[in-house]
Amino acid sequence: MEHNPKSQLKLLVTHGKEQGYLTYAEVNDHLPEEIIDSEQIDDIIQMINDMGIQVVEEAPDADDLILNEINTDTDEDAVEAATQVLSSVESELGRTTDPVRMYMREMGTVELLTREGEIDIAKRIEEGINQVQSSVSEYPEAITYLLEQYDRIKTGQIRLSDIITGFVDPNAEEIFSHSTSAIHIGSEILDNITNDSNENEDENEDENEDEDENSIDPELANEKFRELRKQYTNTSNTIKNKNRNHQDSLLEIYNLSEIFKQFRLVPKQFDHLVNNMRNMMNRVRKQERKIMKLCIEECKIPKKIFLKIFSGKETDQNWFKKEQSSNQSWSKKLEEIKEKVFSSMKKLKQIEKETGLTIEQVKDINKRMSIGEAKAKRAKKEMVEANLRLVISIAKKYTNRGLQFLDLIQEGNIGLMKAVDKFEYRRGYKFSTYATWWIRQAITRSIADQARTIRIPVHMIETINKLNRISRQMLQEIGREPTPEELSEKMLIPEDKIRKVLKIAKEPISMETPIGDDDDSHLGDFIEDTTLELPLDSATSESLRSATHDVLSGLTAREAKVLRMRFGIDMNTDHTLEEVGKQFDVTRERIRQIEAKALRKLRHPSRSEVLRSFLDD
Protein backbone atom coordinates (compact mmCIF):
# COMPACT_ATOMS: atom_id res chain seq x y z
CA MET A 1 0.00 0.00 0.00
CA GLU A 2 1.26 3.48 -0.83
CA HIS A 3 2.27 5.68 2.06
CA ASN A 4 1.04 8.89 0.45
CA PRO A 5 -2.00 10.12 2.50
CA LYS A 6 -3.80 11.24 -0.67
CA SER A 7 -3.36 7.87 -2.36
CA GLN A 8 -4.49 6.02 0.74
CA LEU A 9 -7.68 8.06 1.08
CA LYS A 10 -8.44 7.83 -2.63
CA LEU A 11 -8.06 4.06 -2.44
CA LEU A 12 -10.27 4.01 0.66
CA VAL A 13 -13.11 5.96 -1.03
CA THR A 14 -12.88 3.86 -4.20
CA HIS A 15 -12.96 0.67 -2.14
CA GLY A 16 -15.97 1.96 -0.20
CA LYS A 17 -17.83 2.76 -3.43
CA GLU A 18 -17.17 -0.72 -4.78
CA GLN A 19 -18.37 -2.67 -1.75
CA GLY A 20 -20.92 -0.09 -0.53
CA TYR A 21 -19.58 0.17 2.99
CA LEU A 22 -16.47 0.68 5.06
CA THR A 23 -15.69 -0.52 8.53
CA TYR A 24 -14.26 1.72 11.22
CA ALA A 25 -11.13 -0.42 11.19
CA GLU A 26 -10.62 0.21 7.45
CA VAL A 27 -11.10 3.95 7.89
CA ASN A 28 -8.68 4.00 10.81
CA ASP A 29 -6.05 2.08 8.83
CA HIS A 30 -6.19 4.50 5.90
CA LEU A 31 -6.26 7.77 7.86
CA PRO A 32 -2.97 9.72 8.00
CA GLU A 33 -1.07 9.47 11.27
CA GLU A 34 -1.26 13.25 11.73
CA ILE A 35 -5.04 13.12 12.27
CA ILE A 36 -5.58 12.03 15.87
CA ASP A 37 -8.25 14.47 17.05
CA SER A 38 -11.65 12.81 17.54
CA GLU A 39 -13.54 15.77 16.07
CA GLN A 40 -11.49 15.63 12.86
CA ILE A 41 -12.09 11.88 12.54
CA ASP A 42 -15.85 12.35 13.09
CA ASP A 43 -15.96 15.02 10.37
CA ILE A 44 -14.23 12.72 7.87
CA ILE A 45 -16.56 9.81 8.69
CA GLN A 46 -19.56 12.10 8.25
CA MET A 47 -18.32 13.16 4.81
CA ILE A 48 -17.89 9.50 3.81
CA ASN A 49 -21.45 8.81 4.98
CA ASP A 50 -22.72 11.77 2.94
CA MET A 51 -21.26 10.10 -0.17
CA GLY A 52 -23.53 7.11 0.36
CA ILE A 53 -20.83 4.92 1.88
CA GLN A 54 -21.88 3.44 5.19
CA VAL A 55 -19.29 3.32 7.94
CA VAL A 56 -20.14 0.37 10.19
CA GLU A 57 -18.59 -1.63 12.99
CA GLU A 58 -18.78 -4.95 11.10
CA ALA A 59 -19.43 -6.01 7.50
CA PRO A 60 -23.24 -6.05 6.80
CA ASP A 61 -25.27 -9.00 5.45
CA ALA A 62 -25.54 -9.77 1.73
CA ASP A 63 -29.21 -8.62 1.63
CA ASP A 64 -28.28 -5.18 2.89
CA LEU A 65 -25.53 -4.94 0.29
CA ILE A 66 -28.00 -5.71 -2.56
CA LEU A 67 -30.25 -2.86 -1.41
CA ASN A 68 -27.32 -0.48 -1.20
CA GLU A 69 -26.11 -1.36 -4.72
CA ILE A 70 -29.23 0.31 -6.15
CA ASN A 71 -28.01 3.69 -4.90
CA THR A 72 -24.37 3.23 -5.89
CA ASP A 73 -22.99 6.22 -7.80
CA THR A 74 -20.97 6.16 -10.99
CA ASP A 75 -17.20 6.11 -11.10
CA GLU A 76 -17.14 9.84 -11.91
CA ASP A 77 -19.20 10.56 -8.82
CA ALA A 78 -16.84 8.42 -6.77
CA VAL A 79 -13.82 10.33 -8.05
CA GLU A 80 -15.52 13.67 -7.31
CA ALA A 81 -16.47 12.52 -3.82
CA ALA A 82 -12.95 11.29 -3.19
CA THR A 83 -11.61 14.69 -4.24
CA GLN A 84 -13.89 16.40 -1.70
CA VAL A 85 -12.65 14.17 1.10
CA LEU A 86 -9.04 14.66 0.03
CA SER A 87 -9.37 18.45 0.05
CA SER A 88 -11.02 18.27 3.45
CA VAL A 89 -8.29 16.06 4.84
CA GLU A 90 -5.61 18.32 3.37
CA SER A 91 -7.12 21.25 5.22
CA GLU A 92 -7.20 19.16 8.39
CA LEU A 93 -3.56 18.22 7.91
CA GLY A 94 -2.64 21.87 7.37
CA ARG A 95 -4.51 23.07 10.41
CA THR A 96 -2.34 23.84 13.43
CA THR A 97 -2.65 25.96 16.53
CA ASP A 98 1.08 26.49 16.91
CA PRO A 99 1.71 30.14 15.93
CA VAL A 100 5.33 29.44 14.96
CA ARG A 101 4.30 26.64 12.56
CA MET A 102 1.52 28.79 11.09
CA TYR A 103 3.96 31.65 10.57
CA MET A 104 6.58 29.38 8.99
CA ARG A 105 4.05 27.72 6.66
CA GLU A 106 2.66 31.03 5.44
CA MET A 107 6.15 32.48 5.08
CA GLY A 108 7.21 29.52 2.96
CA THR A 109 4.59 30.26 0.33
CA VAL A 110 6.46 33.41 -0.76
CA GLU A 111 9.26 32.87 -3.26
CA LEU A 112 12.73 34.29 -2.72
CA LEU A 113 13.72 37.31 -4.80
CA THR A 114 16.51 37.41 -7.32
CA ARG A 115 18.76 40.46 -7.67
CA GLU A 116 16.63 41.62 -10.60
CA GLY A 117 13.46 41.11 -8.54
CA GLU A 118 14.85 43.22 -5.70
CA ILE A 119 15.73 46.02 -8.11
CA ASP A 120 12.29 45.86 -9.69
CA ILE A 121 10.55 46.17 -6.32
CA ALA A 122 12.94 48.92 -5.17
CA LYS A 123 12.16 50.87 -8.35
CA ARG A 124 8.43 50.50 -7.70
CA ILE A 125 8.92 51.81 -4.16
CA GLU A 126 10.88 54.75 -5.54
CA GLU A 127 8.21 55.41 -8.18
CA GLY A 128 5.50 55.44 -5.52
CA ILE A 129 7.44 57.82 -3.28
CA ASN A 130 8.28 60.04 -6.26
CA GLN A 131 4.61 60.16 -7.19
CA VAL A 132 3.75 61.23 -3.64
CA GLN A 133 6.46 63.90 -3.60
CA SER A 134 5.45 65.07 -7.05
CA SER A 135 1.87 65.47 -5.86
CA VAL A 136 2.89 67.22 -2.64
CA SER A 137 5.11 69.64 -4.59
CA GLU A 138 1.98 71.06 -6.26
CA TYR A 139 0.76 72.07 -2.82
CA PRO A 140 2.41 75.50 -2.32
CA GLU A 141 2.45 75.28 1.46
CA ALA A 142 4.65 72.16 1.28
CA ILE A 143 7.45 73.98 -0.56
CA THR A 144 7.08 76.98 1.74
CA TYR A 145 7.33 74.74 4.81
CA LEU A 146 10.49 73.02 3.53
CA LEU A 147 12.18 76.34 2.74
CA GLU A 148 11.25 77.69 6.19
CA GLN A 149 12.81 74.62 7.79
CA TYR A 150 16.02 75.22 5.86
CA ASP A 151 16.07 78.84 7.06
CA ARG A 152 15.93 77.52 10.64
CA ILE A 153 19.18 75.65 9.98
CA LYS A 154 20.94 78.93 9.27
CA THR A 155 19.83 80.26 12.67
CA GLY A 156 21.06 77.10 14.40
CA GLN A 157 17.62 75.96 15.60
CA ILE A 158 17.80 72.57 13.84
CA ARG A 159 20.32 70.46 11.95
CA LEU A 160 20.38 69.67 8.25
CA SER A 161 19.93 65.97 9.08
CA ASP A 162 16.61 66.85 10.76
CA ILE A 163 15.16 67.74 7.34
CA ILE A 164 16.82 65.61 4.68
CA THR A 165 18.90 62.44 4.53
CA GLY A 166 20.47 63.24 1.18
CA PHE A 167 19.65 63.76 -2.47
CA VAL A 168 18.63 61.45 -5.29
CA ASP A 169 20.41 61.79 -8.61
CA PRO A 170 17.84 60.68 -11.22
CA ASN A 171 20.59 60.28 -13.82
CA ALA A 172 22.78 58.06 -11.63
CA GLU A 173 23.36 54.53 -12.86
CA GLU A 174 23.29 51.46 -10.68
CA ILE A 175 26.61 50.33 -9.27
CA PHE A 176 27.37 46.68 -10.05
CA SER A 177 30.62 46.35 -8.09
CA HIS A 178 29.12 44.09 -5.43
CA SER A 179 32.30 43.24 -3.57
CA THR A 180 33.59 46.73 -2.81
CA SER A 181 30.22 48.41 -2.33
CA ALA A 182 28.87 45.65 -0.10
CA ILE A 183 31.91 45.77 2.16
CA HIS A 184 31.78 49.55 2.26
CA ILE A 185 28.09 49.75 3.08
CA GLY A 186 28.37 47.00 5.70
CA SER A 187 31.06 48.88 7.59
CA GLU A 188 29.18 52.14 7.09
CA ILE A 189 25.96 50.81 8.58
CA LEU A 190 27.84 49.11 11.41
CA ASP A 191 29.55 52.39 12.28
CA ASN A 192 26.23 54.21 12.22
CA ILE A 193 24.53 51.62 14.41
CA THR A 194 27.44 51.58 16.87
CA ASN A 195 27.35 55.35 17.13
CA ASP A 196 23.59 55.33 17.59
CA SER A 197 23.77 53.02 20.59
CA ASN A 198 25.52 55.75 22.58
CA GLU A 199 22.87 58.36 21.90
CA ASN A 200 19.69 59.15 23.78
CA GLU A 201 16.82 56.83 22.97
CA ASP A 202 14.39 59.62 22.34
CA GLU A 203 11.83 58.64 19.72
CA ASN A 204 12.58 61.57 17.45
CA GLU A 205 16.29 60.80 17.43
CA ASP A 206 15.63 57.12 16.91
CA GLU A 207 13.95 57.87 13.59
CA ASN A 208 17.18 59.30 12.23
CA GLU A 209 19.58 56.97 14.01
CA ASP A 210 21.36 55.86 10.86
CA GLU A 211 21.90 59.32 9.47
CA ASP A 212 25.32 60.88 9.70
CA GLU A 213 25.21 64.63 9.35
CA ASN A 214 28.68 64.62 7.86
CA SER A 215 27.42 62.54 4.92
CA ILE A 216 25.32 65.50 3.67
CA ASP A 217 27.40 68.11 1.87
CA PRO A 218 26.28 71.54 3.19
CA GLU A 219 27.37 73.26 -0.03
CA LEU A 220 25.38 70.81 -2.16
CA ALA A 221 22.38 71.25 0.13
CA ASN A 222 22.66 75.03 -0.11
CA GLU A 223 22.78 74.80 -3.91
CA LYS A 224 19.77 72.47 -4.06
CA PHE A 225 17.66 74.63 -1.74
CA ARG A 226 18.63 77.76 -3.69
CA GLU A 227 17.53 76.02 -6.88
CA LEU A 228 14.26 74.94 -5.23
CA ARG A 229 13.56 78.47 -3.95
CA LYS A 230 14.27 80.00 -7.37
CA GLN A 231 12.02 77.52 -9.18
CA TYR A 232 9.26 77.99 -6.60
CA THR A 233 9.38 81.76 -7.13
CA ASN A 234 9.23 81.33 -10.92
CA THR A 235 6.33 78.89 -10.65
CA SER A 236 4.37 81.18 -8.31
CA ASN A 237 4.87 84.19 -10.57
CA THR A 238 3.86 82.26 -13.69
CA ILE A 239 0.69 80.94 -12.03
CA LYS A 240 -0.10 84.43 -10.75
CA ASN A 241 0.37 86.12 -14.14
CA LYS A 242 -1.23 83.35 -16.14
CA ASN A 243 -3.85 80.72 -15.40
CA ARG A 244 -2.70 77.65 -13.48
CA ASN A 245 -3.89 75.50 -16.38
CA HIS A 246 -1.81 77.50 -18.86
CA GLN A 247 0.87 75.55 -20.69
CA ASP A 248 3.69 77.69 -19.24
CA SER A 249 2.34 77.20 -15.71
CA LEU A 250 2.11 73.45 -16.17
CA LEU A 251 5.71 73.38 -17.40
CA GLU A 252 6.90 75.36 -14.36
CA ILE A 253 4.95 73.04 -12.03
CA TYR A 254 6.59 70.04 -13.69
CA ASN A 255 10.07 71.57 -13.28
CA LEU A 256 9.34 72.31 -9.60
CA SER A 257 8.20 68.73 -9.10
CA GLU A 258 11.38 67.34 -10.69
CA ILE A 259 13.56 69.42 -8.37
CA PHE A 260 11.51 68.56 -5.29
CA LYS A 261 11.74 64.82 -6.03
CA GLN A 262 15.53 64.98 -5.68
CA PHE A 263 15.21 65.70 -1.94
CA ARG A 264 15.31 62.60 0.28
CA LEU A 265 13.23 63.83 3.18
CA VAL A 266 13.49 62.52 6.73
CA PRO A 267 10.44 60.27 7.40
CA LYS A 268 9.16 62.71 10.02
CA GLN A 269 9.21 65.63 7.55
CA PHE A 270 7.78 63.51 4.73
CA ASP A 271 4.88 62.37 6.93
CA HIS A 272 4.27 65.95 8.04
CA LEU A 273 3.83 67.16 4.45
CA VAL A 274 1.60 64.21 3.52
CA ASN A 275 -0.54 64.64 6.63
CA ASN A 276 -0.97 68.35 5.92
CA MET A 277 -2.31 67.52 2.47
CA ARG A 278 -4.51 64.77 3.88
CA ASN A 279 -5.90 67.08 6.58
CA MET A 280 -6.74 69.64 3.92
CA MET A 281 -8.62 66.97 1.98
CA ASN A 282 -10.47 65.93 5.14
CA ARG A 283 -11.66 69.52 5.59
CA VAL A 284 -12.98 69.50 2.03
CA ARG A 285 -14.77 66.19 2.51
CA LYS A 286 -16.32 67.35 5.76
CA GLN A 287 -18.00 70.33 4.08
CA GLU A 288 -19.01 68.28 1.04
CA ARG A 289 -20.63 65.68 3.28
CA LYS A 290 -22.58 68.42 5.04
CA ILE A 291 -23.90 69.76 1.73
CA MET A 292 -24.72 66.26 0.45
CA LYS A 293 -26.52 65.33 3.66
CA LEU A 294 -28.63 68.49 3.54
CA CYS A 295 -29.58 68.03 -0.11
CA ILE A 296 -30.17 64.28 -0.13
CA GLU A 297 -31.63 63.59 3.30
CA GLU A 298 -33.56 66.80 3.99
CA CYS A 299 -34.52 67.89 0.48
CA LYS A 300 -34.79 64.35 -0.95
CA ILE A 301 -32.69 65.06 -4.04
CA PRO A 302 -31.77 61.72 -5.69
CA LYS A 303 -28.11 60.93 -5.08
CA LYS A 304 -27.25 60.46 -8.77
CA ILE A 305 -28.78 63.81 -9.68
CA PHE A 306 -27.03 65.57 -6.78
CA LEU A 307 -23.60 64.20 -7.71
CA LYS A 308 -24.16 65.21 -11.34
CA ILE A 309 -25.03 68.84 -10.53
CA PHE A 310 -22.57 69.24 -7.60
CA SER A 311 -19.37 67.65 -8.93
CA GLY A 312 -16.92 70.27 -10.16
CA LYS A 313 -19.09 73.14 -8.85
CA GLU A 314 -18.35 72.82 -5.13
CA THR A 315 -17.95 76.58 -4.55
CA ASP A 316 -20.33 77.79 -7.28
CA GLN A 317 -23.69 78.95 -5.90
CA ASN A 318 -25.29 79.05 -9.35
CA TRP A 319 -26.13 75.32 -9.35
CA PHE A 320 -28.02 75.77 -6.10
CA LYS A 321 -29.94 78.79 -7.38
CA LYS A 322 -30.70 76.97 -10.60
CA GLU A 323 -32.20 74.05 -8.68
CA GLN A 324 -34.25 76.49 -6.60
CA SER A 325 -35.79 77.99 -9.71
CA SER A 326 -36.53 74.59 -11.25
CA ASN A 327 -39.92 72.97 -10.86
CA GLN A 328 -38.62 69.86 -9.14
CA SER A 329 -40.21 68.38 -6.02
CA TRP A 330 -37.25 69.47 -3.90
CA SER A 331 -37.00 73.07 -5.18
CA LYS A 332 -39.06 74.64 -2.38
CA LYS A 333 -37.21 72.75 0.35
CA LEU A 334 -33.86 74.13 -0.81
CA GLU A 335 -34.78 77.51 0.66
CA GLU A 336 -34.75 75.96 4.15
CA ILE A 337 -31.15 74.75 3.86
CA LYS A 338 -29.83 77.68 1.83
CA GLU A 339 -27.91 79.35 4.66
CA LYS A 340 -26.25 76.11 5.78
CA VAL A 341 -25.22 75.17 2.23
CA PHE A 342 -23.82 78.64 1.50
CA SER A 343 -21.92 78.53 4.81
CA SER A 344 -20.22 75.27 3.78
CA MET A 345 -19.44 76.72 0.34
CA LYS A 346 -17.87 79.72 2.05
CA LYS A 347 -15.58 77.40 4.00
CA LEU A 348 -14.62 75.60 0.79
CA LYS A 349 -13.74 78.95 -0.79
CA GLN A 350 -11.58 79.70 2.25
CA ILE A 351 -9.67 76.45 1.63
CA GLU A 352 -9.14 77.49 -2.00
CA LYS A 353 -7.81 80.83 -0.79
CA GLU A 354 -5.42 79.17 1.69
CA THR A 355 -4.00 76.67 -0.78
CA GLY A 356 -4.16 78.69 -3.98
CA LEU A 357 -5.81 75.65 -5.55
CA THR A 358 -9.34 74.88 -6.63
CA ILE A 359 -11.25 72.13 -4.82
CA GLU A 360 -10.99 70.00 -7.94
CA GLN A 361 -7.20 70.44 -7.96
CA VAL A 362 -6.98 69.58 -4.25
CA LYS A 363 -8.90 66.36 -4.95
CA ASP A 364 -6.70 65.52 -7.92
CA ILE A 365 -3.49 66.04 -5.93
CA ASN A 366 -4.82 63.94 -3.05
CA LYS A 367 -5.88 61.17 -5.45
CA ARG A 368 -2.46 60.97 -7.09
CA MET A 369 -0.79 61.10 -3.68
CA SER A 370 -2.94 58.20 -2.40
CA ILE A 371 -2.18 56.13 -5.50
CA GLY A 372 1.56 56.70 -5.01
CA GLU A 373 1.33 55.76 -1.34
CA ALA A 374 -0.56 52.57 -2.17
CA LYS A 375 1.97 51.67 -4.87
CA ALA A 376 4.93 52.14 -2.51
CA LYS A 377 3.14 50.31 0.30
CA ARG A 378 2.41 47.27 -1.89
CA ALA A 379 5.99 47.12 -3.11
CA LYS A 380 7.36 47.42 0.44
CA LYS A 381 5.04 44.63 1.55
CA GLU A 382 6.36 42.37 -1.20
CA MET A 383 9.97 43.13 -0.26
CA VAL A 384 9.31 42.44 3.43
CA GLU A 385 7.43 39.18 2.83
CA ALA A 386 10.14 37.88 0.50
CA ASN A 387 12.85 38.43 3.15
CA LEU A 388 11.13 37.04 6.25
CA ARG A 389 13.38 33.97 6.09
CA LEU A 390 16.37 36.23 6.67
CA VAL A 391 14.85 37.40 9.96
CA ILE A 392 14.34 33.80 11.09
CA SER A 393 17.96 32.87 10.38
CA ILE A 394 19.26 35.87 12.34
CA ALA A 395 16.78 35.54 15.23
CA LYS A 396 17.88 31.92 15.85
CA LYS A 397 21.29 33.20 16.96
CA TYR A 398 19.76 35.31 19.75
CA THR A 399 17.58 32.73 21.52
CA ASN A 400 17.86 32.12 25.29
CA ARG A 401 18.71 35.76 25.98
CA GLY A 402 15.53 36.72 27.79
CA LEU A 403 13.03 37.03 24.92
CA GLN A 404 10.74 34.47 23.32
CA PHE A 405 11.62 33.33 19.79
CA LEU A 406 8.44 34.89 18.34
CA ASP A 407 9.29 38.20 20.03
CA LEU A 408 12.74 38.11 18.45
CA ILE A 409 11.15 37.47 15.06
CA GLN A 410 8.76 40.38 15.47
CA GLU A 411 11.53 42.76 16.52
CA GLY A 412 13.63 41.56 13.60
CA ASN A 413 10.69 42.20 11.27
CA ILE A 414 10.58 45.79 12.52
CA GLY A 415 14.25 46.15 11.59
CA LEU A 416 13.50 44.55 8.22
CA MET A 417 10.77 47.11 7.51
CA LYS A 418 13.15 49.93 8.41
CA ALA A 419 15.74 48.46 6.04
CA VAL A 420 13.15 48.39 3.25
CA ASP A 421 12.44 52.08 3.83
CA LYS A 422 16.13 53.01 3.63
CA PHE A 423 17.38 50.60 0.94
CA GLU A 424 19.16 52.21 -2.03
CA TYR A 425 19.36 49.80 -4.94
CA ARG A 426 21.62 52.11 -6.96
CA ARG A 427 24.58 51.33 -4.70
CA GLY A 428 24.78 47.85 -6.19
CA TYR A 429 24.70 45.60 -3.12
CA LYS A 430 22.02 43.01 -2.38
CA PHE A 431 19.17 43.87 -0.07
CA SER A 432 20.01 41.03 2.33
CA THR A 433 23.50 42.50 2.84
CA TYR A 434 21.97 45.80 3.91
CA ALA A 435 19.00 44.41 5.85
CA THR A 436 21.11 42.06 8.00
CA TRP A 437 22.56 44.97 9.95
CA TRP A 438 19.17 46.56 10.61
CA ILE A 439 17.59 43.25 11.66
CA ARG A 440 20.50 42.51 13.97
CA GLN A 441 20.35 45.98 15.49
CA ALA A 442 16.58 45.76 16.08
CA ILE A 443 16.92 42.39 17.81
CA THR A 444 19.85 43.40 20.03
CA ARG A 445 18.12 46.68 20.89
CA SER A 446 14.95 44.83 21.93
CA ILE A 447 16.95 42.38 24.06
CA ALA A 448 18.63 45.29 25.81
CA ASP A 449 15.29 47.04 26.34
CA GLN A 450 13.04 44.15 27.33
CA ALA A 451 15.05 41.11 28.43
CA ARG A 452 16.02 42.43 31.87
CA THR A 453 13.58 42.70 34.77
CA ILE A 454 15.03 46.14 35.54
CA ARG A 455 15.51 47.98 32.27
CA ILE A 456 18.97 49.36 31.56
CA PRO A 457 19.49 52.08 28.90
CA VAL A 458 21.02 50.88 25.66
CA HIS A 459 24.13 53.07 25.97
CA MET A 460 24.77 51.51 29.40
CA ILE A 461 24.32 48.02 27.90
CA GLU A 462 27.03 48.91 25.37
CA THR A 463 29.32 50.04 28.20
CA ILE A 464 28.66 46.80 30.11
CA ASN A 465 29.46 44.71 27.03
CA LYS A 466 32.66 46.65 26.45
CA LEU A 467 33.65 46.22 30.10
CA ASN A 468 33.00 42.47 29.96
CA ARG A 469 35.04 42.15 26.78
CA ILE A 470 38.02 43.99 28.28
CA SER A 471 37.67 42.02 31.53
CA ARG A 472 37.97 38.73 29.64
CA GLN A 473 40.95 40.06 27.71
CA MET A 474 42.74 41.16 30.90
CA LEU A 475 41.89 37.85 32.59
CA GLN A 476 43.81 36.05 29.85
CA GLU A 477 46.71 38.48 30.11
CA ILE A 478 47.20 38.68 33.89
CA GLY A 479 45.62 35.37 34.93
CA ARG A 480 43.09 36.87 37.36
CA GLU A 481 40.02 39.08 37.44
CA PRO A 482 41.02 42.74 36.95
CA THR A 483 40.28 45.23 39.72
CA PRO A 484 38.12 48.34 39.12
CA GLU A 485 41.30 50.44 39.23
CA GLU A 486 42.89 48.39 36.43
CA LEU A 487 39.70 48.51 34.36
CA SER A 488 39.51 52.27 34.84
CA GLU A 489 43.05 52.69 33.55
CA LYS A 490 42.44 50.38 30.59
CA MET A 491 39.07 51.86 29.53
CA LEU A 492 39.96 55.49 30.34
CA ILE A 493 36.83 55.78 32.46
CA PRO A 494 36.68 57.15 36.04
CA GLU A 495 36.88 54.46 38.72
CA ASP A 496 33.59 55.47 40.33
CA LYS A 497 31.82 54.98 36.99
CA ILE A 498 33.45 51.54 36.61
CA ARG A 499 32.09 50.54 40.02
CA LYS A 500 28.67 51.91 39.05
CA VAL A 501 28.66 49.88 35.82
CA LEU A 502 29.70 46.72 37.69
CA LYS A 503 26.87 47.27 40.14
CA ILE A 504 24.32 47.83 37.37
CA ALA A 505 25.50 44.74 35.49
CA LYS A 506 24.41 42.44 38.31
CA GLU A 507 21.35 40.37 37.46
CA PRO A 508 18.36 40.49 39.85
CA ILE A 509 17.48 37.25 41.63
CA SER A 510 13.96 36.21 42.58
CA MET A 511 13.18 35.95 46.29
CA GLU A 512 11.33 32.72 45.45
CA THR A 513 14.45 31.01 44.11
CA PRO A 514 14.51 27.52 45.67
CA ILE A 515 17.48 26.65 47.88
CA GLY A 516 18.73 23.07 48.04
CA ASP A 517 17.13 19.95 46.65
CA ASP A 518 13.86 20.41 48.51
CA ASP A 519 11.28 22.97 47.42
CA ASP A 520 10.33 23.96 50.97
CA SER A 521 12.99 26.67 51.38
CA HIS A 522 13.53 29.78 49.28
CA LEU A 523 16.16 32.49 49.03
CA GLY A 524 13.91 34.98 50.82
CA ASP A 525 13.93 32.81 53.93
CA PHE A 526 17.69 33.37 54.35
CA ILE A 527 17.69 37.17 54.02
CA GLU A 528 17.84 39.13 57.27
CA ASP A 529 14.93 41.42 58.08
CA THR A 530 16.64 44.52 59.47
CA THR A 531 13.34 45.96 60.70
CA LEU A 532 12.93 43.18 63.29
CA GLU A 533 15.01 42.49 66.43
CA LEU A 534 17.40 39.57 66.30
CA PRO A 535 16.34 36.51 68.35
CA LEU A 536 19.49 36.75 70.54
CA ASP A 537 18.94 40.45 71.25
CA SER A 538 15.29 39.77 72.00
CA ALA A 539 16.17 37.02 74.50
CA THR A 540 18.83 39.23 76.15
CA SER A 541 16.40 42.14 76.49
CA GLU A 542 13.76 39.89 78.00
CA SER A 543 16.26 38.47 80.52
CA LEU A 544 17.45 41.98 81.44
CA ARG A 545 13.87 43.11 81.93
CA SER A 546 13.13 40.14 84.21
CA ALA A 547 16.33 40.65 86.25
CA THR A 548 15.61 44.37 86.63
CA HIS A 549 12.11 43.62 87.92
CA ASP A 550 13.51 41.13 90.43
CA VAL A 551 16.12 43.61 91.70
CA LEU A 552 13.63 46.48 92.00
CA SER A 553 11.23 44.28 93.92
CA GLY A 554 13.82 44.20 96.77
CA LEU A 555 13.43 47.98 97.24
CA THR A 556 10.59 49.87 98.84
CA ALA A 557 7.68 50.79 96.58
CA ARG A 558 8.66 54.47 96.74
CA GLU A 559 12.30 53.84 95.88
CA ALA A 560 11.39 51.47 93.03
CA LYS A 561 8.98 53.97 91.48
CA VAL A 562 11.51 56.81 91.74
CA LEU A 563 14.11 54.71 89.90
CA ARG A 564 11.57 53.63 87.27
CA MET A 565 10.60 57.25 86.58
CA ARG A 566 14.18 58.58 86.64
CA PHE A 567 15.54 55.92 84.23
CA GLY A 568 12.34 55.35 82.18
CA ILE A 569 12.03 51.67 83.09
CA ASP A 570 8.75 50.30 81.62
CA MET A 571 7.89 53.87 80.62
CA ASN A 572 7.96 55.86 77.39
CA THR A 573 10.68 58.24 78.63
CA ASP A 574 12.70 59.17 81.68
CA HIS A 575 11.77 62.06 84.01
CA THR A 576 13.65 64.95 85.61
CA LEU A 577 14.01 65.42 89.39
CA GLU A 578 11.42 68.19 89.27
CA GLU A 579 8.88 66.01 87.41
CA VAL A 580 9.33 63.16 89.88
CA GLY A 581 9.11 65.62 92.81
CA LYS A 582 5.76 66.90 91.58
CA GLN A 583 4.55 63.30 91.33
CA PHE A 584 5.40 62.64 95.00
CA ASP A 585 4.75 66.23 96.15
CA VAL A 586 8.30 66.66 97.50
CA THR A 587 11.31 68.76 96.55
CA ARG A 588 13.91 67.87 93.96
CA GLU A 589 16.52 67.47 96.66
CA ARG A 590 14.41 64.89 98.44
CA ILE A 591 13.99 62.90 95.21
CA ARG A 592 17.78 63.04 94.67
CA GLN A 593 18.33 61.64 98.16
CA ILE A 594 15.83 58.81 97.60
CA GLU A 595 17.47 57.98 94.27
CA ALA A 596 20.98 57.94 95.79
CA LYS A 597 19.85 55.72 98.65
CA ALA A 598 18.15 53.26 96.26
CA LEU A 599 21.24 53.07 94.04
CA ARG A 600 23.45 52.36 97.07
CA LYS A 601 21.18 49.43 97.90
CA LEU A 602 21.44 48.11 94.33
CA ARG A 603 25.25 48.30 94.44
CA HIS A 604 25.29 45.74 97.18
CA PRO A 605 26.93 42.56 95.84
CA SER A 606 23.84 40.48 96.55
CA ARG A 607 21.82 42.60 94.13
CA SER A 608 24.40 43.92 91.64
CA GLU A 609 25.73 40.47 90.77
CA VAL A 610 22.50 39.66 88.91
CA LEU A 611 22.81 42.71 86.65
CA ARG A 612 26.61 42.72 86.25
CA SER A 613 26.55 39.85 83.75
CA PHE A 614 24.59 42.00 81.25
CA LEU A 615 27.39 44.61 81.21
CA ASP A 616 29.74 42.12 79.59
CA ASP A 617 27.36 41.86 76.61
Swiss-Prot record:
The name on file for this protein is: RNA polymerase sigma factor RpoD
Which molecular function GO terms apply here? DNA binding; sigma factor activity
Q: Do you know which PANTHER family this protein is assigned to?
A: RNA POLYMERASE SIGMA FACTOR RPO, RNA POLYMERASE SIGMA FACTOR RPOD
Sorted alphabetically, the keyword list is: Cytoplasm, DNA-binding, Sigma factor, Transcription, Transcription regulation
Q: Give the start-end ranges of region Sigma-70 factor domain-3.
A: 462-538
InterPro entries under this entry?
RNA_pol_sigma-70_dom, RNA_pol_sigma70, RNA_pol_sigma70_r1_2, RNA_pol_sigma70_r2, RNA_pol_sigma70_r3, RNA_pol_sigma70_r4, RNA_pol_sigma_70_non-ess, RNA_pol_sigma_70_r1_1
- Give any Gene Ontology cellular component: cytoplasm
Family in the record: Belongs to the sigma-70 factor family. RpoD/SigA subfamily.
Coiled-coil boundaries? none
Q: Locate the region Sigma-70 factor domain-4.
A: 551-604
Query: Sorted alphabetically, which NCBIfam families does this protein's record hold?
Result: PRK05658.1, RpoD_Cterm, sigma70-ECF
Kindly state the subunit structure of this protein: Interacts transiently with the RNA polymerase catalytic core.
Give compartment(s). Answer: Cytoplasm
Keyword Cytoplasm in the entry? The reply is: yes
Task: Tell me a GO biological process for this protein.
Answer: DNA-templated transcription initiation
Q: Where is this region: Sigma-70 factor domain-2?
A: 383-453
